[in-house]
A protein has these predicted regions:
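N-terminal leader/targeting and assembly helices and adjacent pre-domain segments
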Residues: 1-161, 248-274
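Acidic, glycine-rich two-metal-ion catalytic cores of nucleic acid-processing enzymes
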Residues: 164-260
Length: 274
């Protein structure tokens, strides 16, 4: 594994552990909402244990869902902001160290961090995407709860539906963290390359594993000028990176993720056709 690939790999590994904290935030919100909805259903049941849709009931449910997800949105944003700032700093510092830059870029880096974290993709920045995901989940759960009540489902069936909805959204949140982190780490490394005075080109490096997409696989091993380099991430959960090319450097080894071993350098296409 190239030193610059390892920087991203190490950051990804550290973040994978932190994502467990994000899952706990989802579990906390899920359990709170389950308790609130159970209390609302119990309060609105008639003597026969039946519950019917009414305006006060829908208001109570909507109010509980809105409050839960407002708090969850704030928690998720704080978590993601911390992950992205740490990811940028680590990628910037380690990349600068590997290239041999020793200047104090503290003031410049603050400007770089703010720009990198808030940069939009397709017109939306990370806070927009967090809000969109949380809002979609809130609406889906609200509608699913009402559908369960309309169809006469028991409270345990309603609870299962809420848990299922949270499970899907937790995966989407983890994917968003990985995708945004890939973007910020790439921004940090490109900031170092562009300001180094020694890096003029980069090499696209994909991952040697069977689920690497054709787009990334086709670009693997290709050289690009700094100002014509592909944007990373190429897609959600992208694990590619850009390696600096200095003087006559050529890669000699790389990691084979399918076997967890180091091999003599070959491109993804060559690896796939072996």
């Amino acid at each position: 594994m190239n030193d610059f690939e390892k920087i991203k790999y190490d950051i990804d590994e550290a973040t994978a552990k932190k994502i467990k904290k994000l899952i706990k935030l989802f579990k906390k919100s899920q359990d709170k909402l389950l308790g609130d909805i159970a209390a609302i259903i119990l309060e609105n049941m008639d003597d026969d244990g039946a519950i019917f849709i009414s305006e006060p009931l829908t208001f109570q449910i909507r109010n509980s869902v809105t409050k839960t997800f407002s708090e969850m949105n704030a928690d998720e944003l704080a978590f993601l902001n911390e992950v992205l700032e740490n990811g940028y700093n680590e990628a910037f510092n380690q990349t600068a160290k590997k290239i041999g830059i020793t200047a104090d870029w503290e003031l410049v880096r603050k400007e770089f961090i703010a720009r990198a974290i808030s940069a939009p993709i397709n017109g939306k920045n990370y806070s927009d995407r967090v809000w969109e995901n949380v809002n979609d989940l809130a609406n889906r759960i609200y509608n699913d709860i009402l559908d369960c009540i309309r169809t006469g489902k028991r409270p345990n069936a309603i609870a299962k539906q809420i848990k299922d909805d949270f499970g899907v959204s937790a995966y989407q949140a983890a994917r968003l963290v990985n995708t945004e982190l890939a973007r910020v780490v790439n921004e940090a490394q490109m900031d170092v390359y562009k300001n180094s005075g020694v890096v003029e080109k980069v090499m696209f490096s994909a991952t040697l594993e069977n689920n690497t997409c054709d787009i990334c696989g086709d670009m693997d091993g290709k050289y690009y000028s700094l100002h014509n380099a592909p944007k990373i991430p190429v897609h959600p959960n992208c694990r590619c990176c850009l390696i600096p090319v200095v003087d006559d450097w050529k890669p000699t080894q790389r990691a084979d993720d399918s076997t967890k071993t180091k091999i003599d350098y070959i491109t993804f296409k060559e690896w796939k056709n072996k």
